[in-house]
Curated annotation (Swiss-Prot):
The active site is at residue 66. It comes from Mus musculus (Mouse). Binds 2 Zn(2+) ions. GO terms for molecular function: 3'-tRNA processing endoribonuclease activity; metal ion binding; tRNA-specific ribonuclease activity. It is found in: Cytoplasm, Cytosol; Nucleus. Zn(2+) 1 binds at residues 62, 64, 181, 252. The keyword Zinc applies. It catalyses: Endonucleolytic cleavage of RNA, removing extra 3' nucleotides from tRNA precursor, generating 3' termini of tRNAs. A 3'-hydroxy group is left at the tRNA terminus and a 5'-phosphoryl group is left at the trailer molecule. It is an enzyme of class 3 (hydrolase). This is Zinc phosphodiesterase ELAC protein 1.
Length: 362
C-alpha cells in the first residue's frame, strides 16, 4: 500500500510567491487527507499532482487564518467540480471548537449549498494550551434555530491517554495531542494498523492446501478444513504481520502540553514540525508561540523519530532554488541547527510541492 506526503504550503503567516500558507496532504492508495488549509490551498492543489475530489478527511491544527482561511473556498471548489449530484461519504473535518460554526456561517452568509455532505468534529482544548488571556469561550456566539446542532462529535481529552481519539477504522488510528501556542493548537498522529503477513507458499504446499478460495480465507484470518479433515489455521501459513507506519504532523507550537505528544510521536517514521525562526531568535519564537530548529529537533530526539521534516518557515527564508544570492544561507542554517541536535541525522527542509514517500516496513 503506497503512502506519501505532499507539502502544498510551507510558509508562515501568509502565502507568498515562494511559499504557500500551511497545507500538507497525506495520500494512501489514492485517498487524500488534508492537514491545514491556509489561504490559497486550492490553487496549490491545482498545481500539484493531487485531486481535490480525492480529499475525504481534513484536519485543522488551530484557528489562525494561515491554517484554515482556505477551507471554505476549497469546499466550494470541490462542490463546483463535482457536478449536480454526488453520491459520496461525507467529508470528515476535525479541528478546534469554533470550526463548525465558522464553516456553517461562511456557507450561510455566501448562500452556498454544497452538493456533498460534510461533518465537523470539534476538539475541546484545555486551559493550559495557550496564555490565559488568549483563551476564548464560544458560548457567547449567537445561536439561531438553523445553527448546526448535533453535527459531528464534540471530542474531549482522554485524561488517561492524554490525547483525543479521532479515527479508529480497519486501517488507521488517528489521535490528536495538545500543543502550546498563542491559541489552542493540536498535533496529529496517524498510525497504520498492522497488516496480516503474506502467505508462505512453501508451507501451503507442504501442508497440502490447494490453491483457490482457501488461500483467501487464510489470508483473511479464517481457518480452513482440508478434504482429509486436517484443520489449517492462519498462523500455520502466514508470515509475520507487517508493522504499520506512523506519520505525525504538528501545528504551530512552542512546546507540547502533557506527555501525550511524546507518546504518540514515539518512533514516528515521519515527524513534521514547524521551525518558524532560526535559533538566534528563540526568545522571539517562544514569545509568539513558535519553534526554532533546535526546539523541533529536541522534540524529534525525545521521540526517537526516524525522520524530521521542518516546515512553516518565516517568509524571509526562501527555498534554496528560488533564493537570490546570499538568501540560501539562511534556510541552510536552519538545517544545520537541527542536525547539530540530532547528531548529524539528516533533516529535511520542506518546500512547496515536495513529495516524501513512506515505504512499507519490512
Amino acid at each position: 500500500m503506497s503512502m506519501d506526503v505532499t507539502f502544498l504550503g510551507t510558509g508562515a503567516a501568509y502565502p507568498s510567491p515562494t511559499r504557500g500558507a500551511s497545507a500538507v496532504v497525506l495520500r494512501c492508495e489514492g485517498e487524500c487527507w488534508l492537514f491545514d488549509c491556509g489561504e490559497g490551498t486550492q490553487t496549490q492543489l491545482m498545481k500539484s499532482q493531487l485531486k481535490a475530489g480525492r480529499i475525504t478527511k481534513i484536519f485543522i491544527t488551530h484557528l489562525h487564518g494561515d491554517h484554515f482561511f482556505g477551507l471554505p473556498g476549497l469546499l466550494c471548489t470541490i462542490s463546483l467540480q463535482s457536478g449536480s449530484v454526488v453520491a459520496r461519504q461525507p467529508i470528515e473535518i476535525y479541528g478546534p471548537v469554533g470550526l463548525r460554526d465558522f464553516i456553517w456561517r461562511t456557507m450561510e452568509l455566501s448562500h452556498t449549498e454544497l452538493v456533498f455532505p460534510y461533518v465537523v468534529h470539534e476538539l475541546v482544548p484545555t486551559a493550559d494550551q495557550c496564555p490565559v488571556e488568549e483563551l476564548r469561550e464560544f458560548a457567547h456566539m449567537d445561536e439561531t434555530d438553523s445553527s448546526p446542532k448535533g453535527q459531528g462529535r464534540t471530542i474531549l481529552l482522554d485524561a488517561e491517554e492524554n490525547s483525543y481519539c479521532l479515527v479508529d477504522d480497519e486501517q488507521f488510528v488517528v489521535k490528536a495531542f495538545r500543543l502550546f501556542h498563542r491559541i489552542p493548537s493540536f498535533g496529529f498522529s496517524v498510525v497504520e494498523k498492522k497488516r496480516a503477513g503474506k502467505l508462505n507458499a512453501q508451507k501451503l504446499r507442504d501442508l497440502g492446501v490447494p490453491p483457490g478460495p482457501a488461500y483467501g480465507k487464510l489470508k483473511n484470518g479464517i481457518s480452513v478444513v482440508l478434504d482429509n479433515g486436517v484443520t489449517i489455521s492462519p498462523q500455520d501459513v502466514l508470515k509475520k504481520p507487517m508493522v504499520g507506519r506512523k506519520v505525525c504532523i504538528l501545528g504551530d507550537c512552542s512546546g507540547v502540553v502533557g506527555d501525550g505528544g511524546v507518546k504518540l510521536c514515539f518512533e514516528a517514521d515521519l515527524l513534521i514540525h514547524e521551525a518558524t525562526l532560526d535559533d538566534s531568535q528563540m526568545d522571539k519564537a517562544r514569545e509568539h508561540g513558535h519553534s526554532t530548529p533546535q526546539m523541533a529537533a529536541a522534540f524529534a530526539k525525545l521521540c526517537r523519530a526516524k525522520r524530521l521534516v521542518l516546515t512553516h518557515f518565516s517568509q524571509r527564508y526562501k527555498p534554496t532554488a528560488l533564493a537570490r544570492e546570499g538568501e540560501a544561507d539562511g534556510i541552510a542554517e536552519l538545517r544545520k541547527q537541527a542536525e547539530a541536535v540530532l547528531e548529524l541525522q539528516e533533516v529535511t527542509l520542506a518546500e512547496d510541492f515536495m513529495v516524501i514517500g513512506i515505504p512499507i516496513k519490512k
